[in-house]
Amino acid sequence: MDPNTVSSFQDILLRMSKMQLESSSEDLNGMITQFESLKLYRDSLGEAVMRMGDLHSLQNRNEKWREQLGQKFEEIRWLIEEVRHKLKITENSFEQITFMQALHLLLEVEQEIRTFSFQLI
């Protein structure tokens, strides 16, 4: 994984964990959990691409990996919409910066996962 992406994930997760949104901390905790899950999934796809022979073991281990890939893209789209919504309603500049960075990271990770998945297909 690109060191910049790792630090971006860590920075955003740290910032989000410090935020107290007016709406609900449960919403934010859910977003943080999904960000962490997305990071792990992205890492595993990247590692599979690095080990070219891993495609067969990936397919053998889990025949539904394409379905999982589709679910991850749905999660990314949902997270993008949630982040955009939070960005629109927040007036706190710290939160705005955090959500802008999170949105940028989500779009970047979506593109990376697409690239990895095309290499695996």
From Swiss-Prot:
The keyword Ion transport does not apply. Pfam families: Flu_NS2. GO terms for biological process: exit of virus from host cell nucleus through nuclear pore. InterPro entries: Flu_NS2. A motif (Nuclear export signal) lies at residues 12-21, 85-94. Keywords: Host nucleus, Host-virus interaction, Transport, Virion. It is found in: Virion; Host nucleus. GO terms for cellular component: host cell nucleus; virion component. HAMAP family: INFV_NEP. Mediates the nuclear export of encapsidated genomic RNAs (ribonucleoproteins, RNPs). Acts as an adapter between viral RNPs complexes and the nuclear export machinery of the cell. Possesses no intrinsic RNA-binding activity, but includes a C-terminal M1-binding domain. This domain is believed to allow recognition of RNPs bound to the protein M1. Interacts with protein M1. May interact with host nucleoporin RAB/HRB and exportin XPO1/CRM1. Average number present in a viral particle is estimated to be 130-200 molecules. Belongs to the influenza viruses NEP family. This is Nuclear export protein. It comes from Influenza A virus (strain A/Leningrad/1/1954 H1N1).
